[in-house]
């Protein structure tokens, strides 16, 4: 169907909303948003990070393609590392913009990263779903899942949360 320039301008400006817009929650790769959401859930349940024996990260195949670093040399690489981000979150690190400007990986983050493995599990109904399974030294198993990251069209911010996000961005905060 051909459209004239006049027809294109008829409803110009009526609705500037972008359909299915995602709002980025964290100051690192958006491909890690779901795994970060799950890690923050687990941090609430974890009493002592020293009790962690093993952590398994489950992704849909290729859903982690942008998360190219499994081991990092410096925090700037950690922006693209599921292992780094999960370790830092579980250790209670503040992952703001300044964190990723550090020259070296903090030893406790690097140590915890060695206990983390990525696995792949096809989830045809939701390719964004991620799961973290954490085994503790006492035999307990903790698990958290994120079906859709906060800020996605399926789990959108409220108006108040959007205003807070804007205020943080203006103040250069994470």
Question: Model regions: which residues?
Answer:
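Terminal-appendage/accessory-domain detector
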Residues: 1-174
